[in-house]
Amino acid sequence: MFIDKLIESIKAKKSPVVVGLDPRIEKTPQFIKDVAFKRKGENIEGISEALYLFNKGIIDAVYDIVPAVKIQVAFYEAYGIEGFKAFFKTAEYAKSLGLMVIADVKRGDIQEVAKMYSKAYLQNQLFDAITVNPYMGEDTIMPYVEDAIKYNKGIFALVKTSNKGSKDIQDIKTTKGEYVYQSVARMINRISNSAIGKYGYSSIGAVVGATYPEEAKVLRKEMPNCFFLVPGYGAQGGTVEDIMDCFDENGFGAIINSSRSVIYAYQTPYWKDVYSEYEYAQAARAEVILMTGMINNGLVKRKYIAC
Amino acid sequence: MFIDKLIESIKAKKSPVVVGLDPRIEKTPQFIKDVAFKRKGENIEGISEALYLFNKGIIDAVYDIVPAVKIQVAFYEAYGIEGFKAFFKTAEYAKSLGLMVIADVKRGDIQEVAKMYSKAYLQNQLFDAITVNPYMGEDTIMPYVEDAIKYNKGIFALVKTSNKGSKDIQDIKTTKGEYVYQSVARMINRISNSAIGKYGYSSIGAVVGATYPEEAKVLRKEMPNCFFLVPGYGAQGGTVEDIMDCFDENGFGAIINSSRSVIYAYQTPYWKDVYSEYEYAQAARAEVILMTGMINNGLVKRKYIAC
């Protein structure tokens, strides 16, 4: 079952950190672009190759210390066919090193269409889980839930997202005296009952932004079944203290994604004097170790986990 | 400007009908599969070729009588790289015959990611417009709006969708005494002010399901700037009477999509004794002509347009 495997991997790696593979060609080290462009030409193929090679370096550097990677499909989809090739190759490489792979696709559509998205990602052995958008309602989520159960996969439904604009729709106050994201949360938590694993969590989880700690605290109580995929840590502004309430009292219940802060760690003030661009992958590893240490330290302070 | 071009095309073709290219391999005529499988093998490549050949037949049969086609990406995305090739080839072929192409992708994500989706579709000359999901808020829509203005493209944001489950989130009552979809509508209508064309409509439109005529009537008034892309007609249950309130008093304001009822018209009770599967494209043309006639007749009855 997806969620049991995820929890066991978090335990084994002693880390709830997920590395987000959101590569941008303009931030890719020149030496990687040189190799890729020489191999495939200075074109879409070369760009896609560079993104893949960049990812491969990151994966090699972190596969033994994180349970999963999250691949944001848009960074590949932007380059069409060649981009998708890099997306699939990245997933394949991550899986080959034992990582769980979350395809961050945020798809959502009517049932007949959702079935096709589910075929694309949940029925694809390269991916362990996907993110989905709940705006169109429960019937549009069910095809993913059915496939999650059938193929031992997971889904994370958007509940309260990390961006500023998440207030526009998600924070609308309803006549039930709650916010829209709480209504979504209740719907997802109810659906998640159908896929609960041996540790009490469901393979149907939720996306809850690191940037809204108060909301996360409420949601942790209102969605007891649901593991949280937490974006927004690091570059988007979320801190260790902000994410603590995403966890339960045993230190589970959340995986914390960081993309830019990890994969471009070598460009940050903290690491730029230590690592050159040639060492971008070591910098990413150092940042993951730092981030994991800080999060685990936060959990120890809360007495959620032992030292 | 996208919306002006769309309106002029509706006038020129005398039809607000959009054909949805949502091909399913299991419903594809055998003679097409035979050709495709012989050419590419009985595999993903062959399936994708069959979907493309099927679409090509439909496009050849309807390009002179409809302003646009809507291509639902999931039906291609399900087949990975090869599927995407068929998706792009379909768009290219439709454009080559002067059709406007709406990529029904329903993407939605934080700004940095939305920019990449916009690069994938709005910055791609194959597509004239895309559908987007507003759940994550205004800041996640703006990258599409900026590109729509810059590249003369359009967007249709989900407001009230055609499926039954659309009630779950979209119909939540808010403390303002309205429904969530009305809050979304207000947000989109406000955003749409930045892209109004010479006929008074904006290149920023809305998806409003044919299956909810009462809601559409309200939304037509609350979103005066916004053209509606109306799914749900035909196979999903929407009738001519259901969609009339999507139009304004001049007979504009909406394009009506039909997918299954058109592309598989030859299998419907109405046409199956007239057309064989070899004539699936003629059947699609006949259905489009019938549908256009019925809609235009409805508009005449309302005195929105002259005979």
Swiss-Prot record, chains A, B:
It comes from the Bacteria. The active site is at K106. The keyword Coiled coil does not apply. This is Orotidine 5'-phosphate decarboxylase. Its EC number is 4.1.1.23. GO terms for biological process: 'de novo' pyrimidine nucleobase biosynthetic process; 'de novo' UMP biosynthetic process. It holds the Pfam family OMPdecase. Keywords: Decarboxylase, Lyase, Pyrimidine biosynthesis. Belongs to the OMP decarboxylase family. Type 2 subfamily. Pathway: Pyrimidine metabolism; UMP biosynthesis via de novo pathway; UMP from orotate: step 2/2. GO terms for molecular function: orotidine-5'-phosphate decarboxylase activity. Transmembrane segments: none annotated. The gene is pyrF.
